[in-house]
Curated annotation (Swiss-Prot):
GO terms for cellular component: cytoplasm. Residues 774-933 form the Helicase C-terminal domain. CDD domains: DEXHc_TRCF, SF2_C_TRCF. Its main location: cytoplasm. Residues 597-758 form the Helicase ATP-binding domain. A motif (DEEQ box) lies at residues 711-714. It comes from Borreliella burgdorferi (strain ATCC 35210 / DSM 4680 / CIP 102532 / B31) (Borrelia burgdorferi). This is Transcription-repair-coupling factor. GO terms for molecular function: ATP binding; damaged DNA binding; DNA helicase activity; hydrolase activity.
Length: 1125
């Protein structure tokens, strides 16, 4: 449903809308009042439609207001542009976020191009200068189909515009050149573009998906590429700046601008080199709309006071910054007049006021009977009723609940409020008003974002690798070797004592990234040593044992009959509808899998894997609710008292509208309460009991236990695990783990153990604003004071325990009034629990900690985290720590600090920036998560596996495990051998096709992992899509891979070139197709040769065959053995 069109039709005769149009046509200043909720956005869009220029300027007070209005407007239009102001933190040495630069340049470009739209600006942006039209538009780079470009020139231009050359484009501001393909991810765009060249001519321009790398269908004839920032620091601009500031005072900044053409906090200087104001550039007859700013003078004064305070603090800290009086207009010089005023109350400033009567809130508090009664009354009175569902799955649930009211429309609508207009008899009711959940947070999910990253993505120059036959070495380079008339690439791997092997590219599939030990502790294998063979044999033995155990467990579980629960009832649907977020696709899948288990006779023993915050608890609560609806009791088992308390609070809040009794057992519960709980558990009065391993003791018995939910099972002791094994035999079990597991292990175990994996994170339920900065007392003081001023709490994390106490002294000096606690691994378990308990209860405002907080509890009130010496942590750790905040409804902040004295290299800075800049994390992050996957393997298969993983590497370990399970389950034959191909050919990746070695390894790995003809077709398509037309040299490699598939199908084990003939060796004599050979010889007498000395072989003659045609010739003729009749 198009809500904008729907409302426009319903309100087509509305007198207020007619008045609005008249006033705008006659240039009469008027105010609007009585509007509510989403209706504000509808009115703003109407003003834009009535505008003579097709655009409006909407002035809002601040960023918060801008975000709220934008969210509603996005439902009904995509013509929205925003001009936010730069962060005031520039006065503390912190640059603005890249998104602000992107949105500003998009706003200014469209504004100067006179494109229709709603142009939203915060008041601050009107007080500061912007570049004029000519200055801005001259920096736009235009590309057109069928025009000629020079790749060297385009690279130079893009770098000038602020773009960065990378191996693969994944985020705005990156570009790459791959042969005749140029990928650019323009600033301000949702998707990158791919330019296909034919020599220097642009043959095609298309957008593509940065995750799948697949092109969109629609072709683009021309495209305009925006610069990163509105100011380009060319020589002229830098010289202008030098005349405006004391060059001695700002020497360092000026040097950076001269050298790098950009610098942190450079936006502070923009108004000094810009030359106009937005207010002076607004086109005539464009309505200027004031959104709820009742007193411009007062608001402008507040802005000046804010900046004056920051300026004074920075001066006291010895920082050189620009006086705000030089860059901000004051009220006297601000002369912009509004045409329309949105006002919550009737304004005296306008003679004309249009008053609407809109209701945006009507809560039904999950009382479905009351809701139905109200709806029936509305329908009798001729109302049109629309329920705004949050998602398709919610729509289906609502259809079921309101099935007796067929006249009630149920549509998926992403609006922020209900809308009731009595006069026009329309009621649009949010599902959150029916279920009293508050507005759901909606984000779009792409399943492709969870696409598995194969190990080949990670193999980089000088990284550790495993060759299946030779062991652990270091990948040095891809080396081109010419011998007589042949030319091939080889992979150079260095082993212990500097020994080197040159591996033919056909063996790329035998090379994997080594993941196991810390790089400092990795021991390289010796080529001639038997250590690798021994390590492989030991690992194989242990893997066989693990596979046997898993298969035995699987068989035992399959033979037991369990509880069969009924289908979902109305209460279950109501419970699920009250979830205050949209489910991720993975959550929906996991819930479906769990319910299918519960509604069958098999005993459920399912593992639910997913990172902290990925939604495991919600999935578990739905399973618990289903068990209670089936008249069964539920145990929720937690490894610590604090986690048990947290689960109790979460369950109580989530189940509050339902008649389900929940209790918690922990050491914080008094003895008399414990004995009451014990009795009620035994009598069946308690539906859900939450607690630590104490619940497993004999004195606690349930009347009718149906489900046990285990949180972080690996953290329990041996005794508890043994007890759980007993319970699992007859009771459904759902185990939760926050440690991710590798996809390959998941695929291995999927047949033996029921596993649901949550790999898609909820898309930024609350935005975390992250900063990467050098250590600064001023910054730490600001971060803490800002959080405490909104009654929040702060984490300050450091890798070193001793330094925590130094930091405590520093914080006490900076914020003497703050209540501070310290927590680290040297404290006892009880001490840690007490401190955390008190922090949750807000007895402390600041918690100084090591990475002990990286996993576990949610503290919604703690929304600022400062990580000192961030460069000392792994990327995975930083990601986990960042996830400690943003768990509630407040905006969250993460500060990643490093010491200036450390002189971090560019790679280290980029590595850290990946965490701070982008919520969408790519391959680099997934690679960093591998250390967590090792923990995941240990958790699933036993910690004792760690030694084997270290000795042969994680990827090879999992390959062996997968084969062992497949073999024992009869899925593959005992020893499947690779086809041994020894053919003289020329095959490599030309330099102009893929220049960097990472891309080359990726291509080689893909080619030599091909197992089917379909895979070959897919890879041919991918290569053409990513790099351009496939050259002859790569085609030879693909033909070689396809030849291997064909040989395998025909039971051929070896293809070996000998004296202008090819030996074709079969697995056994029985495999030789003698009838087909005779048929071929009758037609082509000299094509095949039989030699009695080679009983399992035949020979293919290829005299007078060109080298370039050789593999094609071999493929075609071996194919005759399969297809001749």
């Amino acid at each position: 449903m198009n809500i904008d069109e729907e409302l426009t039709t319903i309100l087509k005769n509305n007198s207020n809308l007619k008045k609005m149009k008249e006033f705008l046509e006659q240039n009469i200043f008027f105010s609007l009042t009585g509007y509510e909720g989403f209706f504000k956005a509808f009115l703003i869009k109407k003003i834009k439609e009535y505008s003579k220029t097709g655009k409006i300027i909407l002035i809002v007070k601040d960023e918060h207001t801008l975000d709220k209005i934008k969210n509603d407007l996005q439902v009904i239009t995509n013509q929205i542009f925003e001009l936010n102001y730069f962060s005031p933190l520039v006065y503390k040495g912190i640059g603005s976020k890249s998104t602000i630069f992107n949105e500003r340049i998009k706003f200014l470009f469209n504004f100067y191009k006179k494109n229709p739209g709603i142009y939203i600006t915060v008041l601050k942006s009107l007080l500061s200068k912007i570049p004029d039209k000519n200055t801005l538009l001259k920096n736009i780079y235009k590309i057109e189909k069928n025009t000629n470009i020079n790749t060297a020139d385009i690279e130079k231009t893009l770098i000038t515009l602020g773009y960065e050359k990378t191996l693969r484009v994944t985020i705005p501001g990156e570009f790459t050149v791959k042969g005749e393909i140029i990928d650019i991810y323009p600033f301000g765009e949702q998707n990158p573009i791919r330019i296909a060249l034919n020599f220097d001519k642009i043959e095609e321009i298309k957008k593509f998906n940065p995750l799948t790398q697949l092109k969109h269908d629609n072709e683009i004839l021309e495209f305009q590429i925006l610069p990163k920032k509105e100011i380009i620091w060319d020589d002229k601009t830098i010289n202008t700046l030098k005349t405006k500031i004391k060059s001695v005072e700002y020497k360092k900044i000026l040097e950076e601008l001269d050298f790098k053409k950009e610098t942190k906090t450079e936006e502070m200087f923009y108004p000094l080199v810009a030359n106009t104001y937005l207010g002076d550039e607004i086109e005539k007859h464009t309505p200027i709309v004031n959104f709820e700013i009742n007193n411009f003078e007062k608001e402008i004064e507040k802005i000046h006071q804010e900046y004056e305070k920051l300026y004074k603090e920075a001066e006291e800290a010895g920082k050189n910054i620009i006086d705000p009086k030089r860059i901000l207009l004051n009220y006297k010089t601000f002369n912009l007049k509004s045409d329309v005023l949105f006002s919550k109350i009737k304004s005296l400033k306008s003679k004309e006021t249009i008053e609407f009567k809109i209701e945006s809130e009507r809560n039904f508090f999950s009382n479905i009977a009351l809701t139905k009664e109200e709806f029936e009354n509305w329908l009798k009175n001729g109302f049109k009723i629309i329920i705004a569902a949050e998602s398709e799955s919610q729509k289906e649930k609502l259809k079921y609940i309101f099935k007796e009211l067929p006249k009630v429309s149920i549509e998926v609508l992403k609006i922020s409020s209900s809308l009731i207009i009595e006069k026009e008899k329309i009621a649009i009711i949010l599902e959150s008003n029916i279920f009293n959940t508050g507005q759901k947070i909606n984000k779009a999910f792409e399943s492709s974002k969870t696409k598995a990253i194969d190990s080949f993505v990670e193999i980089e120059k000088n990284s550790h690798v495993v060759h299946i036959n030779h062991g652990i070495g270091i990948f040095r380079q891809i080396k081109r070797i010419k011998t007589s008339s042949l030319e091939k690439d080889y992979i150079e791997i260095e082993y212990a004592e500097g020994e080197k092997l040159f591996i033919p590219i056909e063996q790329t599939n035998l090379i994997q990234k080594y993941i196991g030990s810390d790089p400092k502790n990795i021991k390289l294998d010796k080529i001639s040593s038997k250590t690798w063979i021994k390590n492989k044999a030991n690992a194989k033995k242990r893997i066989e044992e693990i596979a046997d155990k898993l298969i035995e467990l699987y068989s035992k579980r399959e033979s037991i009959k369990g509880i069969k629960y009924p289908e979902d009832n109305e209460l279950q649907l109501l419970f699920e509808s009250e979830f205050p977020y949209d489910e991720t696709p993975d959550q929906i899948r996991a819930i479906k899998e769990i319910k299918e288990d519960m509604m069958s006779f098999k005993v459920m023993d399912r593992l639910l894997c997913g990172d902290v915050g990925f939604g495991k608890t919600e999935v578990a609560m739905r399973a618990a609710f289903k068990a209670v609806m089936g008249n069964k009791q539920v145990i929720v088992l937690s490894p610590t008292t604090i986690l048990a308390e947290q689960h109790f609070n979460t369950f109580k809040k989530r189940f509050k509208n339902f008649p389900i009794k929940i209790e918690v057992l922990s050491r914080f519960i008094k003895n008399n309460a414990e004995s009451r709980i014990l009795k009620e558990l035994k009598s069946g009065k308690i539906d859900i009991i939450i607690g630590t391993h104490k619940i497993l003791s004999k004195k606690f018995t349930c009347k009718n236990l149906g489900l046990i939910i285990i949180d972080e099972e690996q953290r329990f002791g041996v005794k508890e695990k043994e007890k759980l094994k007993e319970i699992r035999i007859s009771v459904d079990c759902l185990a939760l783990s926050a440690t991710p597991i590798p996809r390959s292990l998941h695929m291995s175990l999927i047949k033996l153990r029921d596993i649901s994996v949550l790999k898609i994170p909820p898309q930024n339920r609350v935005k975390i604003e992250a900063y990467l900065e050098s250590f600064s007392e001023l910054l730490i003081k600001h971060a803490i004071e800002s959080e405490l001023s909104r009654d929040g709490q702060v984490f300050l994390v450091n890798h070193n325990i001793e330094e925590l106490y130094y930091l405590k002294t520093l914080i006490e000096r900076l914020t003497p009034y703050a209540r501070i606690a310290i927590i680290h691994g040297k404290l006892t378990g009880e001490e840690i629990e007490n401190i955390m308990h008190n922090f949750i209860k807000k007895a402390y405002q600041i918690l100084l900690a090591t990475t002990i907080i990286e996993n576990g509890i949610d503290i919604p009130n703690a929304n600022t985290i400062i990580i000192n010496n961030a460069n000392k942590f792994g990327l995975a750790q930083l990601y986990q720590l960042k996830g400690r905040v943003g768990r509630g409804s407040q905006k969250a902040y993460a500060y990643f600090l490093y010491q200036d004295s450390e002189k971090l290299n560019e790679r280290s800075i980029e590595r850290l920036r990946a965490i701070t800049e982008f919520s969408e994390l790519g391959a680099g992050f997934k690679i960093a998560m591998k250390d967590m996957e090792i923990r995941g393997v240990g958790n699933l298969l036993g910690r004792e596996q760690h030694g084997e993983i270290e000795s042969i590497g994680l990827d090879y370990y999992l390959t062996m495990l997968n084969k062992a399970i497949e073999k024992k389950m009869g899925k593959i034959s005992s020893d499947e051998e690779e086809v041994d191909i020894k053919i003289n050919y020329s095959g490599f990746i030309p330099e102009n096709y893929a220049k960097n070695e990472q891309d080359k390894i990726l291509i080689y790995k893909k080619i030599f992992k091909i197992q089917t003809e379909e895979e070959s077709k897919k890879i041919r398509s991918e290569l053409h899509n990513d790099f351009g037309p496939i050259p002859e040299e790569i085609n030879s490699l693909l033909m070689l891979a396809e030849l291997k598939i064909l040989a395998k199908d025909l039971n051929i084990t070896k293809l070996k070139e000998k004296n202008r003939a090819l030996e074709i060796e079969y697995k056994n004599i029985e495999s030789i197709p003698m009838e087909k050979i005779i048929e071929i010889l009758q037609k082509h007498p000299n094509l095949l040769i039989l030699n009695p000395s080679y009983q399992k072989s035949i020979f293919l003659s290829f005299k007078n065959i060109e080298k370039s045609e050789k593999i094609n010739y071999i493929y075609k003729n071996i194919n005759l053995l399969k297809t001749s009749t």
